[in-house]
């Protein structure tokens, strides 16, 4: 086992969406988090989901839970297609507030999904399915 692997900080990923009053919408984020959890074994130790508003867990709750499970570094991913006020201002402010209680924890906020060839594949897949 490499030294880097032995001493790597325990990392958590929090996937954040807007949140909805519709259970089905919130359940989709749970499923995404489960899929990511299965795909990133060995790279990310803890995977959580959170909502900006309208549903639980909140960003603060997911941050606190990650720390309680031993996270030393937290990566927050805004699960949004495009950059905007939520991903550029609201989520960073909410994460900063949550992190205040845990000054020993480092955190990073990723870019939203954005433009990526795999997004195009998903769009085309949806078009083909709609055409049937």
Q: Residue spans of the language-model regions?
A:
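Active-site-proximal alpha-helix that buttresses catalytic centers in soluble enzyme cores
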Residues: 1-132
């Amino acid at each position: 086992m490499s030294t880097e692997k032995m001493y790597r900080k325990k990392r958590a990923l929090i996937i954040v969406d807007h949140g909805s009053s519709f259970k089905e919408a919130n359940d989709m984020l749970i499923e995404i988090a489960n899929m990511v959890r299965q795909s990133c074994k060995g790279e990310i130790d803890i995977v959580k989901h959170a909502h900006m508003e309208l549903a639980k867990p909140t960003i603060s709750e997911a941050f606190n839970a990650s720390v309680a499970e031993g996270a030393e570094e937290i990566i927050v991913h805004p699960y949004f297609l495009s950059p905007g006020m939520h991903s550029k201002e609201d989520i960073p402010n909410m994460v900063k507030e949550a992190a205040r209680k845990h000054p020993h924890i480092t955190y990073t906020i990723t870019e939203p999904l954005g433009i990526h060839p795999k997004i195009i594949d998903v769009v085309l897949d949806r078009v083909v399915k709609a055409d049937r």
